Amino acid sequence: MQTKDIAELLNEPACTHNTKSKSGCARPKPGATAGGCSFDGAQIALLPIADVAHIVHGPIACAGSSWDNRGTRSSGSTLFRIGMTTDLTEQDVIMGRGEKRLFHAIKQAVNTYSPAAVFVYNTCVPALTGDDISAVCKAAAEQCGVAVVPVDCAGFYGTKNLGNRIAGDAMFKHVIGTAEPLPVPPASQRDGITVHDVNLIGEYNIAGEFWNVLPLFDELGLRILCSLSGDARFREVQTMHRAQANMVVCAKALLNVARKLQTDYQIPFFEGSFYGVTDTSQAFREFAQLLNDPSLTARTEAMIAREEAKINTLLDPWRDQLRGKRVLLYTGGVKSWSIVSALQDLGLEVVATGTNKSTEEDKARIREIMGEKTKMITDGSPKALLGAVKEYQADILIAGGRNMYTALKARIPFLDINQEREFGYEGYSGMTELARQLALTLQSPVWEAVRQPAPWVINHA
């Protein structure tokens, strides 16, 4: 990838910070290695597309050390769970066999699994040796009769967030707009209800949590053309250009896709979240507002009133147990504010939140929810996190899996909120699961036990 192409991806017109004198995303600082590379970002953005063969072109470690690190779920094909790599060795590099190995890997994947398409992820070694993956993908597509999409995402290009944008750019250039959606099936048509086509961008169906919300879309007459990329299929991605409205769930990841769909196809979009009662209701209201259908607006308000009444009845016992507990939230992106809203719905007090991967829009939403004097944390080192827990007198640390052992070694209750988790928290029904996990964590008898002096210390005293 050329330097000018990387600079263009870093410069996102849809971000508000582009209006400042120094526009574009901040470049990574030397030594700031935590957080993943461009390859990691591109792979986790596209890997949930379930019926595609995902081939990592590079040494075995690039695939082996990162495969399936996003806990997405599929309702059908499980092809995306199969790790494929060209497994480049030192001899392959010396002899210049990289392109040949890639071509044969694509053929083998097509012959063995008959995928809907093949995605090829470029990594550092073949990028440095100059393998022309675009030419190889084009030749393989002509011979195999299957779409082969090059994703040029070598790790040294930049950060994980840049990789997300590279993935979105590849989808827009090579996939979106290459097929038309099927007509609405008769079973989905109801008298007096107009079916509207919508997309979700940056929704990854972690732990199957989007399935909590999907029935509500069906009830309202909203047909999801594509959820990029949780539980998605290749053909669904091809038809995204025919939606009437888009919802961006994770702004920092795939905002460029929403912006280009708006520019080229005049599809309006909004940024929202399905975490928490308030934000879930607001997301459906935003869809109704963008689609400008009075009947849809009426159905939406009726559905929201019903679901909120039902979930509030279920949450009241949990709120009695959780009210007043202090939470330190260290995550990033959309979760830095959407999880805050969900926790506040449960009566917890969020004393500080992490903003290491949050956009300017995310930070503005945090201030709107928590107030102008809210504490934002950018240093995620173990020492800094433990210091923040002590300073703000937090009862629990909610963060990603990499911070789990930091909390447990310090005998601090911990709840995993990032992509590796096993529980889904989206939608109205997801709130009961979030409340249950918080209560189980905070009320576990293990914390009282581990904070007691060891028996030999007591005996010695």
Task: Label each PLM-derived region with a short phrase.
Residues M1-A461:
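An N-terminal assembly and electron-transfer interface module characteristic of large anaerobic redox
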